[in-house]
Amino acid sequence: MAPLATSTVTSTTITQGPAPPTHHAHPAFPAHATLSPTHWEVWVFDAVSQDPASNAALEISFFRDATGLFRGRAPLRIAFHAQLPGGGDDGAGPPEAVHFDEVADESVVEDRGDAIVSTWRSARDPARTTTFEYAADLSGAVLTFDLPEVRGTVTYTNAGGGSSAVDGFAAFAPKIAYAQPMVAAGVEAALTFADGRALRFAGKGGGDRCAMQAPMPLLLDENTYVRGHAGPYTFALLRSVSRLDRGRECVRASLARDGEVVFVAAASDVSLADDHVVVRAAHGGNVRGTFADTSSGWRLDFVSPAKGKHWHFDVQHQVVWWSIPLGPPPAKLGNNGFTSRVSGGEVGGEKHEGMAVVGHLQMPQMPATKK
């Protein structure tokens, strides 16, 4: 049966000007119909083992993004970050990271009715592919890798089950739309790398979506992404400081208990009436990023005055997972990833422990386009 809708883009076909919208309601389907030097979008999947001694983790981002063409950045790419536990012959060493960018020549996304299926064909060999498939009701997702660097699957099972009523994108910040298709999921990872190493773990994770109408350096001063787990709780948080809106803090947070979303907020101002989330940097820990930011974690408060509920979680960085400079010296601006310890729960109730995936970046100013 033919797909209900198809979005195909190639790395050499770029719209000169704003990308037209697809007008598709499902958050896993592309928001933009074409590649454009001004519009871009990303699908993000993460997972982390809940064994604090392991630090096994994944973060995979699928980019349709031509905003970096002027500086030689491939418009179709998959950013792959893996962290393998226990390096060394005895397995007791520090975790080992695997990072690479897979460049694609073509990205095809199909709405097949019961699933949104995306295939990314390698620029090196079109027979080599990476795919992701979301169930239409968001009950699960599967990532499949058939690349020289890595082969295998990562399977997500939505802890909240599926739903016939699927929320789409919502405005997050000026020129930025955001969605959290899968807040809390169980994850099974089974990957084998070219050198024979393997990453196999059962953990927790989820999936996010973001679509922007300008290059990120024009929109944001900094950006923080956290998906944390502690006992029955999972929280997904995106926090950005807007460059267009004079430093306004923009935030979107969801909190789930046993898979059921019990709290959603898009406000960071403390209120006696409205749901809000308070995000504060933590300092004094043993692990912090490699750039200007000196925080060693985050302190998160999810507050619902109307329900009389307050949840608090401490996120303490455990391992610096990746470190990507985003500007030349002397400015110490860049993108850090962490696996982090989580502790917390409902204030006055039982305290739970777990692990999180954290990304934090500070953006340089947009460089001038070469003439």
How would you label these PLM feature ranges?
Residues 1-371:
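Structured soluble/peripheral alpha/beta segments that form catalytic or ligand/cofactor-binding pockets
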